Swiss-Prot record:
Gene3D superfamilies: 3.40.50.1400. PANTHER family: FERROCHELATASE, FERROCHELATASE, MITOCHONDRIAL. Keywords: Cytoplasm, Heme biosynthesis, Iron, Lyase, Metal-binding, Porphyrin biosynthesis. InterPro entries: Ferrochelatase, Ferrochelatase_AS, Ferrochelatase_C, Ferrochelatase_N. GO terms for cellular component: cytoplasm. The keyword Cytoplasm applies. GO terms for biological process: heme biosynthetic process. Its EC number is 4.98.1.1. NCBIfam families: hemH (TIGR00109). GO terms for molecular function: ferrochelatase activity; metal ion binding. This is Ferrochelatase. The keyword Metal-binding applies. PROSITE patterns: FERROCHELATASE.
Length: 391
């Protein structure tokens, strides 16, 4: 029987406070997260941003226990999925490839080669495809595969996105309905989807399908929820986690919460639609920051739906995805990592840089000026930004 390696790709996260700075450096070193006009500036800029953000990020992680649970939860998901696949008769072993923290993709590749797997199924733990999540992970995997002749010999199939998969939708409906049932008036409970945002330019200039997939997914969940409950609920979609000076996908979560409070919404069911495991965005940003905003806005009952984690229906759905991937026409790593024709990725290509209104990424000239000012102040330890309390 062929030995199947199932590669689960995820973001990764710092497990200890001392990991926060290096994790941020890895994150911002990715040109699909922060774009610069010149390759030589990528890592210095990543160092600068991670240095400036490290203290604030450390405080956020301290508020949830001192580190991210994403590795532990992903390992639990991997074990449960492996057991489920073996129950179904597959000789499958799961492996984890984190993009920005341990265990890195290189480690998973080494383990799969050592275990002599006969075939690999790549399953990103992102239901929706985005340039900056699944896209980045696929492209990293392809780069490593292209440079490793032994790894290149192993047949590989990929799942690109799976937001419409029945097991995923059913598990979301089950978790949402649990929170709705706790409300005094279940039909009036407001379903509030919040997805991780991306810069608007990713969609409008780069052709990222993420926004459309998120919108389609929220409607699929609402339709399935209505069938499950026998009644419809009002619902809203927003985008969270915006950083930096550029415009991100709207509406922003914090602004929608304020509007819902003005509309006298009392029971709010918060659904983290783009997250399949608990981590900093659910435990700190939603549970602490957004809950406080909602309460100040007058929302009395703020109920956050748990992330899927190892929900049995979800794990069943993941196993079905793996089996379908093996049975259906192959999607190879070249196809999976291919972005829409509109997309231009640095360093191979560049989105438009210059003094124009269409550029939603940092203008290269401004970015370099800011970088130099900040770099000089960090080295010197004094300057106008220090006097203003920014550094």
């Amino acid at each position: 029987m062929n030995k199947i390696g199932v590669l689960l790709m995820n973001l990764g996260g710092p497990e200890r406070i001392t990991d926060v700075g290096p994790f941020l450096y890895n994150l911002f070193s990715d040109p699909e997260i922060i774009r610069t006009p010149f390759p030589a500036f990528q890592k210095p800029l990543a160092w600068l941003i991670s240095t400036l953000r490290s203290t604030t990020s450390q405080q956020a992680y301290l508020s949830i226990g001192g580190g991210s649970p994403i590795r532990r939860i992903t390992e639990q998901q991997a074990r449960e999925l492996q057991s489920k696949l073996r129950e179904k008769g597959l000789n499958a072993t799961t492996y984890i490839a984190m993009r920005y923290w341990h265990p890195f993709t290189e480690s998973a590749i080494a383990d799969m080669k050592a275990d002599c797997v006969d075939q690999i199924v790549v399953l990103p733990l992102y239901p929706h495809f985005s340039i900056s999540t699944s896209g980045s992970s696929f492209r990293e995997l392809k780069k490593l595969r292209d440079s490793d002749n032994d790894f290149k010999k192993i047949p590989m199939r990929c799942v690109r996105s799976w937001f419409s998969q029945s097991g995923y939708l059913k598990s979301m409906v089950e978790l949402i309905s649990q929170q709705i049932s706790c409300c005094e008036s279940p039909p009036n409970a407001h379903i509030f989807f919040t997805a991780h945002g991306v810069p608007k330019s990713y969609v409008e200039e780069a052709g990222d399908p993420y926004k459309q997939q998120i919108e389609d997914c929220s409607l699929l969940i609402i339709n399935e929820l209505e069938k499950y409950l026998g009644h419809s609920n009002p619902h809203t979609l927003s985008y969270q986690s915006r950083v930096g000076p550029v415009e991100w996908l709207k509406p922003y979560t914090e602004e929608v919460l304020a509007d819902l409070g003005k509309s006298n919404v009392e029971d709010l069911i918060v659904v983290p639609i783009s997250f399949v495991g608990e981590h900093i965005e659910t435990l700190q940003e939603i549970d602490i920051e957004y809950k406080e905003i909602a309460e100040k806005a007058g929302i009395k009952n703020f109920r956050r739906v748990k992330a899927l984690n190892t929900h049995p229906t979800f794990i069943e759905g993941l196993s079905d995805l793996v089996i379908s991937c093996l049975e259906e026409p192959q999607v190879n790593i070249e196809e999976a990592s291919k972005l829409p024709e509109k997309v231009k990725l640095y360093p191979q290509e560049k989105w438009q840089w210059g003094w124009n209104n269409s550029s939603e990424v940092w203008n290269g000239r401004v970015a370099m000026i800011v970088f130099l000012v900040l770099f000089i102040e960090l080295i010197a330890g004094s300057g106008p930004l220090h006097r203003l309390g920014i550094l």
